[in-house]
Swiss-Prot record:
The keyword Nucleotidyltransferase applies. This is RNA replication protein. Keywords: ATP-binding, Helicase, Hydrolase, Multifunctional enzyme, Nucleotide-binding, Nucleotidyltransferase, RNA-directed RNA polymerase, Transferase, Viral RNA replication. Its EC number is 2.7.7.48, 3.6.4.13. It comes from Foxtail mosaic virus. It comes from the Viruses. PROSITE patterns: ALPHAVIRUS_MT, PSRV_HELICASE, RDRP_SSRNA_POS.
Length: 1335
């Protein structure tokens, strides 16, 4: 029932009267509110538009306005803006280009608000109060400001200018009037509200369709609608569209680079399309968008009436275009529309290409090639009419969805204002007044402060003094537009040259950062009071203009740190201290704050800020000074530079807090100390009189990783103590000029830092990684590694910065720290695939073409054949005693219940059918069949998991760091070269030929069965799921009571399988050339080869370890995919192939939807990928000694040792979904490690006699007509048994009684029942060898 119908259901007159009375009260309140914000009468056409945007109006109002609807939109956005302004009227707001009378729409009284207006056009002096009009742009001294319907006339430079002149300004709100349809020069989308007039370089916005109150816009003003961020020098401003109503928009601007949407949309009343340009010259085509509904109607008309004439088309256009809309089309537009649809009517719409339904297998294979040749022919000779029609119908959707822009304003460019106001505002806006706030007692001859400060602590948190004075704004001299600032011989830092030369800098040239801004070697200067102290160190500090000043610690910060120490949430040594010591520390932090002398030395890394202090200590070793360091690495560096001092002079920060000896302390790199530590130390050090802090506020701060700590909520130390720094040395000796300038630092160091980009991890570099977990794992794999933040104090000639999914989470200071470590070379190693347009590629990737390579086959180079050594004489034959076969079978048959007690049951499909025949022995083997529907659905439920491409992508990104660890472990295990392996096209095509040859070697019926997956209409990422038909013969599954889920087979698009099968085979060939001898992969190897390897490499005196995984295929998630990506990139596989593989794994489609990331049988590289992931995981998890024999095949592995788990890997175990099933063998008779159904024994690689006997019994009990009966499999089983059979008496050295019995029964079955020739020939050869050896 609709809401309107509810009232009709009420029949009681009194109840209806009550409802109407309540409605009347609401209407009165609404009309009262509407009278305040929208009192005007709205024309009927405009009312629907207002209702669409939820703007109320009074239908009975008689008050008129020339553009009432447009005015309603303006006021509505004012009210919306008031929600983002301070809620209390006592907090001032600056209103720019706004009349004071409009404050009522913001619900403000205005007694504390400020107005900034300009005299731009003649009427401004009449509408703005004189005391609010400025001839220049003054500083905004409030935190919030508002610009009303004016910002759209200015460029982005004006916005930068407002923020750069107003350091206190935090939020700027602005309303703008810009119709988005003007991008396409369309008619007004809301003609009842406004109309548009277009000219060559400008357009007019006419509210209400009337002249007199119009806005004139340049077309570039529309760029405000796509504004995202703007960067100018050190200032970045982010804008967000808060609300849009028709052509009126409310934007909010803030400092900093914040998150913005990629796209911004605007309302489109109906879908519009832009017709393609089918005539030349281009001007004789339809230029403006038209409604898509009309375009489709006109198309269907001209195709339905037969031979359409020009008159027919004219008549249809006249019939379907409403009288009110005829004026929207110009005569030439109508002519072009008529000719366009006449052309569509004359073109043939019958498909000119061949259909494929009746194709034979041969035609189906060659059809794509024929179609491609036809397409090329038509491009050269001309298209058919059907192709012309399809091209003429490629209309462009006009949806008013635009990509949000990031832009940078040009360096030294004046604010581009409109020409009619440019001359008026040029003096006030394009010239910035230069001033600096001074504080405290002057230092005498201290050089003048620099205005180029760019330090976090140098804003509004400076200590105040009674002598502070307010500086009035003075208009600066006029600057001419579009002229470069003249270069002067005198430098802004000339007064500081003495200090700079003392640090080793000539500072005689200008250097610029990447944005073109001048880099000053001295920043953030302050005038602070001097407080002399009785120590010889004072003269040194005075000489370098670093005199100390008085300081009292913030005890709240000290107490916060003490609470975390007591709770064991910070520190390592402090956690172990007794409760009494912690209580004492907490008590001291609550005492009256001590007053000490404090000197803060700020400077870039390598600037020499600590040089004067170290020189003083070197020349005055008798002066007791204690140096406190945040890390052991930094402590070792100080000890190396000052070897004459006692080692206790240099202490880590925790030891110093435990034993604060002396009165003078230096804290180096103090920003790396825990927040609140310095204050707590001051309170805890009884004799402390002078504290010197050195550090770089641009580098990483300390961050406590323990959960629920309090100190991370405190302000960084650089913010607290930065106000006590007299200047910042923004120059370095460490980094050459190109790297330093890129970081915004001055440098005179010769040479250049080479910056490289790679996708492969190089060795021989100091690795910088974003996380502690990754650092520990890199270190455990023999890589020298530090975190981005933890590398502070390290200087290395060559640095490799590992970029992964954690890198974007790092702060600017952390990245600055990492980038400033190198002196000669920086390698940026990206371990992530390119994700910029991943989802677009998923949607837009075309079908992979099924094309056979009809080129000459190139045979892959194989290993040289080795000559077989001479055979040893066969041992004498031995007759085994006859055993009872029933004893072997009883253990399997006796515990088995009835069939239906073992089968899987489903309410919809009934029982499965895996337990077959009445033979109790055959019932011990589960027979899984593809036609078993119950088993199929049980298998799908257990083996497959549905997901979405977005969830898969999230999974992939989340587990990338795990994949990096796997790749490093695999690379180390397989002894791959450090540099990427150059791609070999000849080997690639040879592998492709092998894959193709293998596929074509299938019988014809198998090729016909796959015809659906060979068709180009089968999606490249689609797959069909089948249940594998098989007898379950794994030794641990034989005789299992409950029926288990089966195995799935995934059938992909055949060209997809061949492409990635080629990739896997190519990497296999490369792998074989580097694979160490102690590792064997059971691929393309026979029993004889493996036995020979076992004899040469396996030590049976050591314990052995084997492992299998539970649900191995389903467990290969995003971590394994990242590992495969890195492996493929290291093999230099073409990027388009790697990206296609990632897209396939993240967006594999089946009947249930998208599959989660997992391994699928039949996807191409299944075996190779399974094996290599097994190797990577095993070597990442365990410490495997060098030269230990190892065997791998898929998810099976065998190691000739008892591996020890890496401690660094323990936190990662739960992050993997892999679940191991390890076994340890002592290697003795009857207990040998099993690998792929065989036993690794001192006599070679032999078939497990128990499994062989069980399988033979199953084959013997089948009917001769059934597949897999004894006559079908006897020869194959005999070949498996032959190596064991040939050992003779040596079997007693390896088999126990149970295994010997099983071996005897197998031999007896094959010779007496199957009459196999293999064992009879072997027996004859043994007898001949025995005869000849006796002679």
């Amino acid at each position: 029932m609709s809401i309107e119908a509810v009232f009709d259901q009420v029949t009681d007159p009194s109840l209806r009267a009550v409802i109407q009375e309540e409605a009347h009260k609401q209407i009165k309140d609404l009309f009262k509110e509407t009278t305040r914000c929208n009192p005007y009468s709205i024309p009927q056409a405009g009312r629907k538009v207002l209702e669409k945007y939820a703007i109320p109006y009074n239908p009975y109002s008689l008050k008129l306005h020339p553009h009432a609807a447009s005015k309603a939109f303006e006021v509505s956005l004012y009210e919306a803006a008031s929600n983002y302004l301070p809620s209390t009227s006592s907090t001032p707001v600056t209103f720019m280009f706004t009349k004071p009378g409009k404050l009522r729409f913001f619900r403000r009284r205005g007694h504390v608000d400020k107005f900034v207006n300009a005299d731009i056009v003649p009427r401004d002096l009449a509408r703005y109060p004189r005391d609010t009009v400025y001839s220049y742009l003054p500083e905004i001294t409030t935190t919030h400001a508002f610009i009303g319907d004016t910002l759209h006339h200015f460029g982005e430079d004006f916005l930068v200018e407002v923020f750069s002149r107003s350091p206190k300004l935090e939020v700027l709100l602005a309303t703008m009037v810009l119709p988005p349809e003007a991008f396409y020069r369309m008619e007004s989308l809301h003609p009842s509200v406004y109309t548009l007039l277009y000219r060559d370089d400008r357009f007019l916005y006419l509210p209400g369709g009337l002249s007199g109150g119009e806005y004139e816009h340049r077309y570039k003003d529309l760029n405000w609608l796509t504004f995202g961020t703007v960067t100018h020098g050190g200032i970045t401003i982010t804008g967000e569209r808060i609300e849009t109503k028709a052509a009126n928009h409310l934007f909010l601007f803030r400092r900093g680079r914040l998150a913005t949407p990629k796209f911004r949309s605007f309302d489109m009343p109906e879908p519009m399309v832009l017709l393609p340009k089918v005539f030349r010259p281009a001007k004789y085509n339809v230029q403006k968008p038209i409604p898509r509904e009309k375009a489709n109607k006109w198309l269907m008309y001209v195709k339905s009436i037969g031979n359409a004439t020009i008159r027919d088309v004219w008549a249809k256009l006249r019939q379907t275009i409403a009288n009110a809309d005829i004026g929207l089309f110009s005569p030439t537009e109508l002519v072009h529309l008529t000719n366009y649809f006449l052309l569509l009517g004359r073109l043939d719409s019958h498909n000119s290409f061949d259909q494929v339904l009746a194709d034979s297998v041969l035609k189906a294979w060659f059809r794509p090639m024929v179609a491609k040749l036809q397409e090329i022919k038509h491009k050269l000779m001309g298209q058919t009419q059907f192709m012309q029609l399809c091209q003429a119908l490629e209309m462009t959707e006009v949806d008013l969805v635009f990509e949000v822009r990031d832009s940078k304003t040009p360096h030294k460019q004046a604010v581009p204002l409109d020409r009619e106001i440019e001359n008026v505002l040029l003096e006030g806006v394009s010239s910035e007044p230069t001033y600096t706030e001074t504080e405290g007692v002057a230092d005498g001859p201290l050089p003048p402060p620099m205005q180029t400060a760019a330090e976090p602590s140098a804003t509004s948190d400076e200590p105040e003094s009674s002598s502070s004075r307010e500086i009035e704004h003075q208009p600066a001299p006029e600057i001419t537009l579009d002229e470069e600032e003249p270069q002067r011989d005198d430098l802004p830092w000339d007064a500081w040259r003495t200090q700079l030369r003392a640090l080793g800098f000539e500072a005689s040239e200008r250097q610029y950062d990447p944005d073109g801004e001048l880099i000053s070697p001295i920043l953030s200067t302050r005038r602070l009071p001097k407080t002399p102290i009785d120590t010889t160190l004072y003269a040194t500090l005075d000489k370098i203009a670093r005199c100390p000043t008085f300081y009292k610690p913030d005890t709240d910060r000290a107490q916060t740190y003490a609470r975390d120490v007591m709770a064991g949430k910070t520190g390592a040594i402090l956690k172990q201290q007794p409760f009494e010591w912690k209580t004492t520390l907490k008590r001291k932090t609550k005492e009256e704050p001590k007053e000490i002398h404090l000197a803060v030395l700020h400077g870039a890394g390598g600037s020499g800020k600590s040089y004067a202090l170290q020189e003083f200590m070197r020349n005055n070793s008798d002066t007791p000074i204690t140096v406190i360091l945040p890390t052991n690495e930094l402590r070792a560096d100080w000890k190396k530079k000052l070897p004459a001092h006692d080692k206790d002079t240099f202490m880590t920060y925790e030891n110093a807090l435990l034993c604060p000896r002396g009165d003078i302390f230096i804290m180096d790199d103090y920003t790396k100390l825990p927040r609140g530590y310095i204050e707590a130390f001051v309170q805890n050090a009884p004799a402390l009189s002078l504290l010197i802090l050195t550090g770089d506020p641009n580098q990483a701060e300390h961050f406590e990783t323990t959960e629920d700590n309090e100190i991370n909520s405190l302000a960084p130390a650089s913010v607290v103590f930065g106000k006590f720094s007299r200047y910042h040395i923004n120059a370095t000796h460490r980094n050459p000029r190109n790297l330093a300038n890129a970081l915004g630092v001055y440098s005179e160091t010769p040479g250049e830092v080479k910056v490289l980009y790679t996708r492969n991890i190089k060795t021989g570099y100091h690795n910088l990684v974003p996380s502690q977990m990754k650092m520990r794992n890199y270190a455990s794999l023999g890589q020298r590694a530090s975190t981005y933040a933890g590398c502070q104090g390290i200087t290395a000639p060559r640095v490799q910065i590992i970029l992964d999914s954690d890198t974007p989470r790092c702060t600017r200071q952390v990245m600055y720290t990492a980038l400033s470590r190198a002196t000669t070379e920086v390698v940026l190693c990206n371990t992530m695939p390119d994700e910029k347009s991943f989802f677009q590629k998923v949607e837009a990737t075309p079908y992979l073409k099924a094309i056979l390579n009809l080129n000459k086959e190139i045979k892959v180079t194989e290993g040289d054949l080795t000559e077989e050594p001479p055979r040893e004489p066969a041992p004498p034959t031995t007759h085994l005693p006859v055993e009872n076969r029933i004893i072997l079978n009883e253990a399997l048959v006796e515990p088995l219940p009835d069939k239906h007690d073992r089968e899987i049951y489903s309410n919809s499909t009934g029982f499965s059918n895996c337990i077959q025949t009445q033979d109790p022995y055959i019932q011990a083997f589960q027979h899984q069949q593809a036609k078993d529907e119950t088993l199929f659905w049980a298998t799908v439920e257990k083996r497959l998991a549905a997901s979405t491409p977005k969830d898969n992508w999230t999974e992939f990104k989340t587990k990338r760091p795990l994949g990096d660890v796997l790749w490093l472990a695999y690379k180390r295990a397989m002894v791959l070269p450090d540099e990427p392996i150059k791609f070999n096209p000849e080997l690639w095509w040879a592998c492709a030929d092998e894959v193709q040859k293998t596929y074509l070697s299938k019988p014809i019926h198998a090729l016909k069965n796959g015809i659906l997956r060979q068709s180009p209409d089968f999606d490249w990422n689609k797959l069909q799921i089948f249940l594998k038909s098989q007898w379950v013969k794994k030794i641990d599954k034989i005789g299992k009571i409950d029926v288990n889920a089966g195995q799935t087979i995934a059938a992909f698009y055949q060209p997809t399988v061949m492409l990635f099968g080629t990739m896997a085979r190519y990497m296999r060939r490369i792998r074989d050339t580097y694979q160490p001898g102690e590792i064997l992969i059971n691929c393309e190897k026979n029993q004889k080869h493996i036995s020979k390897w076992v004899e040469s490499n396996w030590n049976h005196r050591l314990p052995a370890y084997t492992n299998d995984f539970t649900a191995y295929d389903q467990s290969q998630d995003g971590a394994m995919l990242q590992f495969e990506v890195l492996k493929a990139l290291h093999h230099d596989i073409p990027h388009e192939v790697v990206e296609a593989y990632v897209a396939l794994k993240l967006n594999s489609k089946m009947f249930l939807g998208t599959l989660a990331i997992m391994r699928l049988t039949g996807e191409g590289p299944t075996f190779d990928a399974n094996t290599e992931c097994n190797i990577a995981y095993t070597h990442a998890r365990f410490e495997i000694p060098k030269n230990v024999a190892q065997m791998y095949a898929g998810d099976d592995c065998a190691l000739n040792c008892r591996p020890v788990e890496r401690q660094s890997f323990l936190p990662l175990v739960e992050k993997f979904t892999l679940k191991s099933k390890p076994k340890v063998f002592e290697q003795k008779v009857g207990s040998w490690p099993e690998f792929c159904g065989n036993l690794i024994t001192p006599r070679g690689y032999l078939k497990d006699p128990m499994k062989l006997q069980h399988c033979l019994q199953l084959a013997q009990r089948k009917k001769p007509s059934e597949p897999g009966s004894l006559k079908d499999v006897a020869e194959n089983y005999a070949m498996d048994l032959l190596p064991t059979y040939e050992l003779g008496d040596a079997l007693y050295e390896i088999f126990d009684e149970r295994q010997m019995n099983a071996h005897y029964q197998s031999v007896r079955t094959l010779i007496t029942c199957a009459h196999t020739k293999v064992l009879r020939v072997a027996q004859a050869l043994q007898e001949d060898c025995t005869f000849f050896s006796s002679i």
